[in-house]
Amino acid sequence: MKASAFVYPWDVNGDPQAAGTIAAIGVQQVTLASAYHSTRALTPRHPRHRIVTAEHAAVLYATDDRWQGRELRPYAAGDWAPGDAFGEAAAALTDAGLEVHTWVVLAHNSRLGAEHPDTSVVNAYGDRYPWAPCIAQPATRAYLVDLAAEAAVRPGAHGTELESLGWYGLQHLHAHDKTGGVGLGDAGLYLMALCFCPTCREGYGAQGVDADELAAVVRAALEPVWRGAPSGGGWAGVEKLLGASPAGATRAWRDDTARTLQEAAVTAVRGAAPAGFQILLHADPVSYHVGANAGVDPAHILSVADGVVVPCAGGTDLLAPFAGAVGAVGVAGAVGVAGVAGVAGVAGAAEGGEVSGGSVIAANFTVVSGMGGSPGTLASDAARARALGATELRLYHAGLASDADLEAVRSALAGL
């Protein structure tokens, strides 16, 4: 079972032992960050530092001239990843016998929101989410599509994994975060993710919903939740709060917006990439979910991309809808796919295209014990994932993990 470990360039650059250490755990591939959000990261084995602070979202390579004269453009990294940090790390990892794929974080950029506040998601209360670019806005979409193509197709890379290629919402580990005081539940979080920027207001209008009335309904529906009432779970909970018709209108707008962006980004990457370049999306099989693992329709996304990376830190249940879509190989459009959508808890099916029987379904496990991971159970977790249809493993994160964690991973992979 092929396994790939996530890595940052700063884990490798300046440490002549790093690439060999990663190769020794038994992975065949690394997923190396080329565009990444702000973070504070541990480097437990690096000879020159122990903590890296990436102060803002940045590309970890030198950009080309496609960004000349454009208001929205990627930011260069500071001293945490100077110059072509990606290229330097990729060369070392390749020399160690590892296949390098890019790791590209897209619609998640707090500096972009701070410097261009009009690009951000605006909730029903008028609060902006600077970490969450609104993916409906034309200029933002153009920026994200071009960033996907440039950051994905780096010299020496054999494929890419596109993260945050969809809506972002309230859920976000912000600096000294204090947003957990009231449990909003799945439905409440959806309402708090609804955007009311001018573009989205027009989008709701095109669905027959007045944006001002919708915002008022959202605020009224959330008022009992702020006072402690449960919001309900799943899409039924959203419909209970908003009403079935308004809820459906918001979802139609948002699903189509995300779907067309994903199609455009994958098309742009394919246009820039050599033959055989693999394109995966970090994805959640519930289309109204938001965050780093974009909500998708499984059948649709597997007809667009070469596969998905599925979060399994909380269990492996999210694999089944994607495996079900692969099981529908050869069935195009809505024929035979609606049942898969029902399993996923999503509405609609792929329109055109076919799901490939060779689609990658990568189960993503956290293997850093200090971050809630369980490297000691990786062998059994991988077996469970394989039984549910996973074809590959993703391991988060080789640079952050302790020596003991890496040894547990090595032992598990040796037995697969």
Regions found by a protein language model. Name each.
Residues 4-12, 65-83, 128-142, 247-257, ...:
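The substrate-binding groove and active-site-proximal loops of carbohydrate-active enzymes
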Residues 310-318, 364-416:
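Substrate-binding cleft of secreted/luminal carbohydrate-active enzymes
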Residues 10-24, 139-150, 289-301, 374-384:
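Short, acidic/polar
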Residues 127-268, 278, 283-286, 291-298:
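Polysaccharide-binding and catalytic clefts of secreted carbohydrate-active enzymes
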Residues 31-56, 82-126, 159-169, 205:
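Glycine-rich, aromatic-flanked loop segments that form ligand/cofactor-binding clefts
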Residues 4-6, 101-154:
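Active-site-adjacent "subsite" loops/lids of carbohydrate-active enzymes
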Residues 229-247, 280-283, 326-333, 353-376:
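Active-site clefts of carbohydrate-active enzymes
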Residues 17-40, 154-159, 299-308, 387-390:
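Catalytic domains of carbohydrate-active enzymes, especially glycoside hydrolases
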